[in-house]
């Protein structure tokens, strides 16, 4: 447990230090109409990171606390019930291939309740068009680090974004788990003002997931969050 907090503290220290580059903090509150997959009908996520500028692009380190339960616990019909928040410590190096094309590679380490959960290597690729449209893909392996020794799964995030004007950015992210054969849809609108940037997101999650009785675990969530870069 001490090692987990030490790693998290180290990443947060990097995020807040005055190195060349930029830092950010972001957080949200998620309201679920069926919170069984999260164990609660209200959850929260917090994240902080720092990007170090370098000759290739930038190296970003970050820490995320996910699945912070704030609402009524969901324990019946496949509900996860009371769970410990997941802690992710990660780093990614981006490479600017051209003024529009970029790639990245990184690694995330997932902990929960003082134990290793998953090893998560990842790769990204993206292209930014002059008309405000951007396309990107992130492919991430979920390698089990527990005694269960579960099969490795792969998560694919395919995102399209559009900068409407200097104040509003819209995006859609499609999340697909290859082995589990589940899919999420995430629609986001961000107010890209100076300073704190609030956003609203609509998520439709766990399409294809079922409980032991064969009932669907699909969840719709309204997400309110904000990010601040400095």
Model regions and ranges:
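Outer-membrane beta-barrel proteins
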Residues: 2-7, 16-230
